[in-house]
Amino acid sequence: MDKFRVQGPTKLQGEVTISGAKNAALPNLFAALLAEEPVEIQNVPKLKDVDTSMKLLSQLGAKVERNGSVHIDARDVNVFCAPYDLVKTMRASIWALGPLVARFGQGQVSLPGGCTIGARPVDLHISGLEQLGATIKLEEGYVKASVDGRLKGAHIVMDKVSVGATVTIMCAATLAEGTTIIENAAREPEIVDTANFLITLGAKISGQGTDRIVIEGVERLGGGVYRVLPDRIETGTFLVAAAISRGKIICRNAQPDTLDAVLAKLRDAGADIEVGEDWISLDMHGKRPKAVNVRTAPHPAFPTDMQAQFTLLNLVAEGTGFITETVFENRFMHVPELSRMGAHAEIESNTVICHGVEKLSGAQVMATDLRASASLVLAGCIAEGTTVVDRIYHIDRGYERIEDKLRALGANIERVKGE
C-alpha cells in the first residue's frame, strides 16, 4: 500500500486549481443511464471511485470514454446487474439502481461493501423506490428492483435527510408517470448539480436546493453536455491548509456560494477572506488561527466532510474549541492519530474538545477514512520532522493528485510506493 512521507514544517501558500466535485460527478455518471442519447460530462475529477463507476457503466453495456470529458452512450445497456466485485469498493454504486429500474424496469445492485442495512441508509433508497411502485427483494446479497411498466409518481416524505436517497428518488422519478414530490429532501449543492444535469437531459425538476423537490415525469431523456460544479470540500481543505500554516492561498475554479458555513468559521478563526465569482483567497497574515466551535449538520449548515480538517485547525489554534458531529457516528478516528503527533484533545460522546498547541511533531500515522486522512497529511505539512501517513488509498478516493497540489504550495511531500 502506498504511503505519503511529509517533511515539515512548511508554510503552504500560492494558487491551487480546484477539481470537479466527486459527490456530484458520481451520481451524474450513474444518472447518465437514464439518457437515450449520448452524454458528455465535463470537469469530472480523476479519482478511483470515478474509474470504478466508469468500469461499472461499461459492464452494464454503456459505451464510456474519457478524453478530458467523460462521454457516456447508454443506448445499448443490456445488463441490469451491478456485481459485487465492483460494488464492494464503493458505496456510490447503489445509484445505479434507480436509473436501471426507471428506464429498463429492472435493476440489481450488490449490497455495498460492509454495509449493514440501517447503518448507512440503504433502506431509504429502497423505501423511496417502493413508494414509486418498484418491487424490491433482498436476495443473495443483492438489492433487486423491478416494476411492470413505468414507475408511478408519489408524495414521498423522507424519514431523515439523506443525500444519497434524495439522488436515487429524484433520478428514478424523472421517468415515472405523473408527479413526484420529495419532502425533507437533502439541500446540498451536489443535489442541485445532479438536478441541473437531469434538466439538461430533458427532465422537469423544480425546488432543488430546498427541502421540497418536485419532479414531473417525462417519457424519455435525451443527451447533452454538462459541467460538474467545483468540489467545495477540496476547496475547504486547501483553505484550511493555508490557515493552519499561517499562509496565503487563492483557490481557482471554486464556487464560493457553496461554502458559506466554512468561510464564516475561517473568518472567526482570524482569516482574511475575499471571494470572486470563481475564486476564493485566504490570508492569515502570518498569524496563528483562533479556536472555533463547530457543529456539523446537513447543508446549509457546517458540512461533516470538513469536520476533520477543522478538528486539526483547532488543535493548533489559540484557545480551546469544541467540535460536535451530528451527521455520522465514529467520525473522530483521526483524533487518536493526531494525538500521536502531540495534539491535545478529549472525546466526549459526539464532541471533541480541542486544546490548541503551539506545534505538532512528525509521527507515523494511519489514514482511516477519506477526510480524516486529508487532515493527517495537512498535519504532516506543519509538524516538525517527518510524518508518514499509511493507507492513503482513502485519500485517492476523494482528492485528485493531492500531493502535486500541496507540493505546488510549498509542501515537502512524496508518495512512497507500497510493496
Curated annotation (Swiss-Prot):
Cell wall formation. Adds enolpyruvyl to UDP-N-acetylglucosamine. Its main location: cytoplasm. Keywords: Cell cycle, Cell division, Cell shape, Cell wall biogenesis/degradation, Cytoplasm, Peptidoglycan synthesis, Pyruvate, Transferase. It holds the Pfam family EPSP_synthase. CDD domains: UdpNAET. Belongs to the EPSP synthase family. MurA subfamily. PANTHER family: UDP-N-ACETYLGLUCOSAMINE 1-CARBOXYVINYLTRANSFERASE (PTHR43783:SF1). It comes from the Bacteria. It comes from Escherichia coli (strain K12 / MC4100 / BW2952). The lineage of its organism: Bacteria, Pseudomonadati, Pseudomonadota, Gammaproteobacteria, Enterobacterales. The keyword Cell cycle applies. This is UDP-N-acetylglucosamine 1-carboxyvinyltransferase. It is found in: Cytoplasm. GO terms for biological process: cell division; cell wall organization; peptidoglycan biosynthetic process; regulation of cell shape; UDP-N-acetylgalactosamine biosynthetic process. It catalyses: phosphoenolpyruvate + UDP-N-acetyl-alpha-D-glucosamine = UDP-N-acetyl-3-O-(1-carboxyvinyl)-alpha-D-glucosamine + phosphate. UDP-N-acetyl-alpha-D-glucosamine binds at R91, R120, P121, V122, D123, L124, K160, V161, S162, V163, D305, V327. GO terms for cellular component: cytoplasm. The modification 2-(S-cysteinyl)pyruvic acid O-phosphothioketal is found at C115. The active site is at C115. The keyword Cell wall biogenesis/degradation applies. Pathway: Cell wall biogenesis; peptidoglycan biosynthesis. Its EC number is 2.5.1.7. HAMAP family: MurA.
